[in-house]
């Protein structure tokens, strides 16, 4: 082998090595970002739970040794309404924490295990919306869930996580003193679950973008309501895992308007 040919092989080898190193760095950075995001979300939710507990029962009360149990019972008994609200808030954050673990596990497995079975669509909605009642009540939202007796063939865990993210978004973006209408239709082999509400306006050219990873809406960012841009991305992925699809319709019936200086519209 001549020196010239050897040099070419050497250059090609070095190029491949550099490309591999660059690829590995990108993979490492992506995995680090996912882990950091997961850790941040779990830490935030855990902090929310502790905050709600300490608002009801102060840390000083928890330092009373053997008497702490009796004292906690007294506080709950004398503040039953507040205790009930605390329970709902803890339940919501615990559900969101479970959803975070489920999503992290599913998205990091090459072939996630999905347990498909028939589940009553109406019951799944009721079970999943329960932890969010309080926030809807605080915003004076009238929740109208139509009756429906059909079942959906789906993986319960991923569908529950999907609905969790939908309701979490709804509590953030729905306009006060309005209605959340959830109804069902049957279409060939599909069951359609439709969420209709007056929500923060989404511009026409954003409709497809809201399903992209790390994308937050223009007005969501402007009004400081944006999350981490994962909610609808996760929803779309999990719906597709269940052989379904999701669509977003904005400005239904030409209902765009302003409330408290914020732009809203009816969406489905």
What are these regions (language model features)?
Residues 48-138:
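Conserved DHp (HisKA) dimerization/phosphotransfer helix of two-component histidine kinases, i.e.
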Residues 177-189:
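Short beta-strand/loop element within the Bergerat-fold HATPase_c
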Residues 243-245:
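Conserved glycine-rich
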Residues 202-215:
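Short conserved segment of the HATPase_c
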Residues 142-151:
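Conserved catalytic submotifs in the C-terminal HATPase_c
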């Amino acid at each position: 082998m001549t020196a010239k040919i050897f040099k070419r092989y050497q250059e090609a080898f070095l190029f491949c090595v550099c490309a591999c190193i660059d690829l590995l760095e990108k993979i490492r950075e992506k995995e680090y970002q996912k882990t950091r995001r997961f850790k941040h979300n779990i830490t935030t939710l855990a902090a929310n739970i502790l905050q709600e507990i300490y608002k009801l029962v102060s840390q000083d009360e928890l330092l009373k040794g053997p008497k702490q149990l009796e004292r906690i019972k007294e506080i709950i008994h004398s503040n039953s309404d507040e205790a009930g609200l605390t329970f709902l808030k803890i339940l919501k954050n615990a559900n969101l924490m479970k959803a975070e673990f489920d999503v992290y596990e599913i998205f990091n497995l090459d072939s996630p295990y999905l347990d498909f079975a028939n589940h009553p669509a109406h019951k799944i909605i009721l079970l999943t919306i329960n932890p969010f009642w309080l926030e809807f009540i605080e915003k004076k939202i009238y929740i109208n869930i139509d009756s429906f007796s059909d079942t959906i063939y789906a993986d319960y865990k991923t569908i529950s996580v999907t609905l969790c993210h939908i309701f979490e978004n709804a509590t953030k973006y729905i306009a006060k003193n309005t209605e959340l209408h959830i109804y069902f239709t049957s279409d060939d082999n599909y069951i359609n679950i439709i969420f209709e509400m007056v929500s923060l306006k989404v511009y026409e050219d954003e409709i497809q973008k809201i399903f992209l990873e790390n994308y937050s809406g223009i007005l969501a960012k402007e009004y400081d309501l944006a999350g981490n841009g994962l909610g609808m991305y996760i929803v779309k992925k999990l719906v597709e895992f269940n052989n379904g699809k999701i669509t977003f319709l904005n400005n239904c019936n030409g209902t765009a308007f302003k409330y408290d200086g914020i732009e809203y519209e009816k969406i489905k």
